[in-house]
């Protein structure tokens, strides 16, 4: 249980170090009426899918880039990209393509440099360790990009909750939960 306690402490430190204005900007983005598209590679892509699912439960129209049923993105749509490094090839290519359509592109990353790109209309910088272990990153007992992926999952789930008018939305969200299992 020491490892679990250490990971929980890492999450507390990382999540409380997130810029409050960036976080609130993401919450406001989620309140929008447009369609939401999510993209990410590897474990970050799995987190993106989990967040897309939860946002769908909240009543939003949501798609995951790369799925066969994902339609074309358009001007009033929002693309949320998860990339720990902020430079993952496919995620950045998807961001550029979406930006060209006029869609709003929002990046969730550890990289303060990546957010300088004019492709991104907004960002949420999570000050977590990456697989590169760059100077200035927090220490972690976890391998690779675990710290970023876990913090992204916690923060984005929290942002969905904060975006809801009714904080106790469980019953309403259950209506959108699968009933085929």
What spans do the regions from the language model cover?
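A short, charged, Gly/Pro-tolerant segment at domain boundaries
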Residues: 158, 164-181
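Short, well-ordered alpha-helical segments in soluble proteins
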Residues: 127-130, 163, 167
